[in-house]
Amino acid sequence: MIYGTIPGVAKPVARMVMGVDNQDDLAQAAPLFDDYIERGGNCFDTARIYMRGGCEALFGEYLAKTGVRDNIVLIGKGAHTPNCTPEAAQSQLEQSLEALRTDRVDIYFLHRDNAQVPVGEFVDVLDALHRKGRIGVFGGSNWSLERFRAANDYARRNGKTGFTVLSNNLALARMVEPVWAGCVSARDPEWLRHLEESGTALFAWSSTARGFFTERGDPSRAAEESEIAHSWHAEDNFERRRRAIALAEAKGTSPVQIAMAWVLSQPFATFALSGPRTLDESRRNIEGLSVTLTDSERDWLDLKRDQP
């Protein structure tokens, strides 16, 4: 495992984050979680909307049975559309903590934004929860750069704690259309520049473009893989895919691991969210952390230069 540091989080944070959203029951989930921890993983991503709180309850049961809460970094998310209000963020957090059988989460994200709500109202609620010790560092998931900056401007003007973490999409493939309604990518140059200059940590979801860098991403399979085609099929992405395949062959690894390495090689703190369904998938993801890229390889993969 490899780790990163986030100001305000006491523990080093595993850069491969285990998503708690693809497991149906504890019998399926516990072996995945156990193996992840045994391989050095310590960061788990939860959200109130996953299975309408069912995934939180499952993970809360796991925490109660294993006693590992103090050894991990716990991410919570709440206030997903259509309940994206400051009041919902507060009430859903209490529901989440009860389900997770803990008194705080280490990292908290508003799962969506609501542009109809003045950004300061979100900051006020999160700052209060932070001061009460219910949440550690906090930020937004699927937030625009304009609103993210506005949140921090408000926090600075009013002596409040600001947003220090972000969870938007970032992948080697450009997200052509949102995977789900309200999804936002951090891939545009202005977002990337802000992340580097501000020191904001990014927790990237769909960091390998949801299968685009496997055989499922081949353009000939557009009809049967319509979800991949909808969000990722574009000529520039096909060229990125071809380059990932070529570099994977040269390095003796897989295109998926090359795509993951691209996300983790950014010049700012990145953490990749992973939602494996099987032990084999989880282990491949962790093994892929050993793949490294030079700056020139990273830029070549992203079509910024002609040679790696």
Role assignments for model-derived ranges:
Residues 70-81, 165-170:
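A short, structured active-site edge motif that brings together acidic residues
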Residues 97-118:
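Active-site groove signature of glycoside hydrolases
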